[in-house]
Amino acid sequence: MSLTRLLIKDFRNIESADLALSPGFNFLVGANGSGKTSVLEAIYTLGHGRAFRSLQIGRVIRHEQEAFVLHGRLQGEERETAIGLTKDKQGDSKVRIDGTDGHKVAELAHLMPMQLITPEGFTLLNGGPKYRRAFLDWGCFHNEAGFFTAWSNLKRLVKQRNAALRQVSRYAQLRPWDLELIPLAEQISRWRAEYSAAIVEDMADTCQQFLPEFTLTFSFQRGWEKETDYAEVLERNFERDRMLTYTAHGPHKADFRIRADGAPVEDTLSRGQLKLLMCALRLAQGEFLTRVSGRRCLYLIDDFASELDDARRGLLSSRLKATQSQVFVSAISAEHVMDMSDKNSKMFRVEKGKITD
């Protein structure tokens, strides 16, 4: 699946744009603040319903406008799909697929699996566990049909349980929430464990190519003690949870630990090495999806040259080309991406929100 056309209206500093895209590499070149990252963000938003630089909708809609509008055309092997997303200042969204309203953002995410690599993406490695849970959950979402519904229900139940902890005095009063929560928690943890076990070899192989000087290990931690039933954990920790007023154990506390030569990667690797590792993990995840489902990711890479020398840029470029996926790359200078270009690539110049090819 590739994005063949993108229409942008009133998104960030872009008043209007209509882009015909390459199924291969698409380069966005311009000075800082020109709007090149806004194009990447528009694509990301079309597939996620939210921007990656700000959760405040007012900062994403162009100044003095009421809403942004994004439209795209996706070309699959057998058919083309038209998609659209409109979002106003109140945060209300309208999703259209093939001309019909009433669709969910999750449907867009399923149609457009994508991997995002940005200078801020180091949080996958040096941020809190929620970023690594999101990494696993992306894979589970695209590999398990029931994951999104289960995950949404889990979030709702944990929130309700936390609210109930402020009101109850005995565990029996909390049991109705736990009877719903326990099977969901165990199912989501099984999916995460199965996914992490399935992808770990792909990650290790790709990371070895990018960072041969390190031995990297990966471990999934489900959020409560091994070999212990979640029901037992919840009941045993009731008084502590009640004092804390939140549920201290469960899949919402899971983590996916990454170590280099036995130490946390954030304590061992340089910024350039962390970026390489982040790229390797995103590539491995995208390639795993293709291998198990036949579907290809879109790759969005912001500020391609930052933190990487010529050799490392060349390695990333060659691996991206090998995926045969659609790739969007932003850079300050065309010189930084010329080695990636071929006869099927497209180069877009971005200046003050205006885009030309």
Swiss-Prot record:
<dbReference type="InterPro" id="IPR018078">
    <property type="entry name" value="DNA-binding_RecF_CS"/>
</dbReference>
<keyword id="KW-0234">DNA repair</keyword>
<keyword id="KW-0238">DNA-binding</keyword>
<dbReference type="InterPro" id="IPR001238">
    <property type="entry name" value="DNA-binding_RecF"/>
</dbReference>
<keyword id="KW-0227">DNA damage</keyword>
<keyword id="KW-0547">Nucleotide-binding</keyword>
<dbReference type="GO" id="GO:0000731">
    <property type="term" value="P:DNA synthesis involved in DNA repair"/>
</dbReference>
<dbReference type="GO" id="GO:0009432">
    <property type="term" value="P:SOS response"/>
</dbReference>
<dbReference type="GO" id="GO:0003697">
    <property type="term" value="F:single-stranded DNA binding"/>
</dbReference>
<dbReference type="InterPro" id="IPR027417">
    <property type="entry name" value="P-loop_NTPase"/>
</dbReference>
<comment type="similarity">
    <text>Belongs to the RecF family.</text>
</comment>
<keyword id="KW-0067">ATP-binding</keyword>
<dbReference type="GO" id="GO:0005737">
    <property type="term" value="C:cytoplasm"/>
</dbReference>
<dbReference type="InterPro" id="IPR042174">
    <property type="entry name" value="RecF_2"/>
</dbReference>
<dbReference type="InterPro" id="IPR003395">
    <property type="entry name" value="RecF/RecN/SMC_N"/>
</dbReference>
<dbReference type="Pfam" id="PF02463">
    <property type="entry name" value="SMC_N"/>
</dbReference>
<dbReference type="GO" id="GO:0006260">
    <property type="term" value="P:DNA replication"/>
</dbReference>
<dbReference type="GO" id="GO:0006302">
    <property type="term" value="P:double-strand break repair"/>
</dbReference>
<comment type="function">
    <text>The RecF protein is involved in DNA metabolism; it is required for DNA replication and normal SOS inducibility. RecF binds preferentially to single-stranded, linear DNA. It also seems to bind ATP.</text>
</comment>
<keyword id="KW-0963">Cytoplasm</keyword>
<feature type="binding site">
    <location>
        <begin position="30"/>
        <end position="37"/>
    </location>
    <ligand>
        <name>ATP</name>
    </ligand>
</feature>
<keyword id="KW-0742">SOS response</keyword>
<protein>
    <recommendedName>
        <fullName>DNA replication and repair protein RecF</fullName>
    </recommendedName>
</protein>
<dbReference type="GO" id="GO:0005524">
    <property type="term" value="F:ATP binding"/>
</dbReference>
<keyword id="KW-0235">DNA replication</keyword>
